[in-house]
């Protein structure tokens, strides 16, 4: 039996603490020999069968933990590479000029779904749900891989395939847990879907782009029409969510019927529906979110991918926006708010949207023209200020020293070339 490819993956990506639990290795293994085994602290790719007699390194080639051909990804999917330099080792701090901090982007917007049901069901503006429903109803896609919860364990994140408006609404809202989102792509293909949108974290999007560059993975990637990623500060291990339920809400896990990390009103409450029909909830963004930081997994502590540099469309809250950041919204006077209609809308929840690719721009503009969404285009100065602030106030500040320490000690980090 030859398992040299998996041995490379294990040594370089798994045992190094860099595995992001995306599921790409399990997805592409031609022998079905890799399984993400579940533990309390997370999932771990492990051999559950034979790799076969022939050399195969597909699992290693798709992994987003170590090696990212950023220049080739940008040239292929965005039409050019970013100006000036780009990160080499992930501990290299970007230069203050050029596109190092922001990546390649076409435009930045803030907006919300015009459909009241979609907006009220969302974390902020409902743009992701609105775009996917529009694309589905106009035959741009025939399904979407979304993050939901496992019916058997309703507080555990799990990928699922949405093929109806109702499915998409069921998948609305952030799921703050690492989970093998890319295994949902396998399910979508088995269902016979040919035009698939997939939502993912920035690190999962790296795996998708690596697969899309390699003809060996066409069976998985030829059907991908759109990648939407979220602005990501970190995800937190499942036992962090369990702690919030049992300690933050004083609810037994076996009593949980449904979970929302950020139920309305904006910016959102941590809400659990009990099997008894009762609800238990507490403020999330301004309270419980801080407690989750203690449960940040190792791989998130060595990541700088906050604004999803390789996705078609990036979505998130308006934190760090020069005009619409939530701390600013409540400080405006009525007179100030009357001068900028964005403020009133943002107080009810708006999504920040970064358009990176032509594909993303076409779908976004179609939904805008089709009155599925309302959007306000940031000025070039606002767009730049927003993206730089998201970058500067996030992962480089917290994770940069950790990454530099790993480099100094000869430990592997994610590298871009």
What role is predicted for each listed range?
Residues 122, 127-136, 140-191:
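Portal/gating segments that form or line small-molecule/metal binding sites
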Residues 2-6, 16-18, 24-44, 56-88, ...:
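Iron-sulfur cluster-binding cysteine motifs and their immediate structural context
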Residues 4-9, 13-16, 45-51, 282-291:
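Short, intrinsically disordered, charge-biased short linear motifs at domain edges
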Residues 123-127, 151, 198-208, 234-236:
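Gly/Ser/Thr-rich loops at beta-strand to alpha-helix junctions
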Residues 58, 66-128, 132:
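Electropositive, gly/pro-rich neighborhoods at or near active sites that engage anionic ligands
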Residues 230-243, 265-267:
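Short, conserved secondary-structure transition motifs
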Residues 214-229:
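A short alpha->loop->secondary-structure connector
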Residues 141-142, 249-417:
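Long, compositionally biased charged/polar accessory segments in the mid-to-C-terminal portions
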